[in-house]
Amino acid sequence: MTFNLCVLTPNRIIWDSEVKEIILSTNSGQIGVLPNHAPIATAVDIGILRIRFNDQWLTVALMGGFARIGNNEITVLVNDAERGSDIDPQEAQQTLEIAEANLRKAEGKRQRIEANLALRRARTRLEAVNVIS
């Protein structure tokens, strides 16, 4: 049994297809979703979306947003997203190193908050690459 998953950013459709299962990072932790899941709306955290599609797991790095689950359909609206298979591992590692350096040299509260968010995004992108099997 499957359900429809649609992952959207303001600029493009990342995913729109039938899937068997997902694991979604929300602001209150990860949730697993199978067909006939109870209807909910939830905030999506910066994190990994794991998608079970044709008996293999795929990853998408999500950069925060909202999800609506109901009637065997999930719509995920996020600020930005990248499929794990589209991310260059070397570039993701370099971005992580730059984000770590920026956090170390951040001076004001605002700079620390922005550097921390950049670090979370960089870690998420690298994790999306590294969990590809």
Curated annotation (Swiss-Prot):
GO terms under cellular component: chloroplast thylakoid membrane; proton-transporting ATP synthase complex
UniProt GO molecular function: ATP binding; proton-transporting ATP synthase activity, rotational mechanism
Membrane topology of the entry: Peripheral membrane protein
Physiological role: Produces ATP from ADP in the presence of a proton gradient across the membrane.
Similarity comment: family membership: Belongs to the ATPase epsilon chain family.
HAMAP family, sorted: ATP_synth_epsil_bac
Name of the protein described by the UniProt record: ATP synthase epsilon chain, chloroplastic
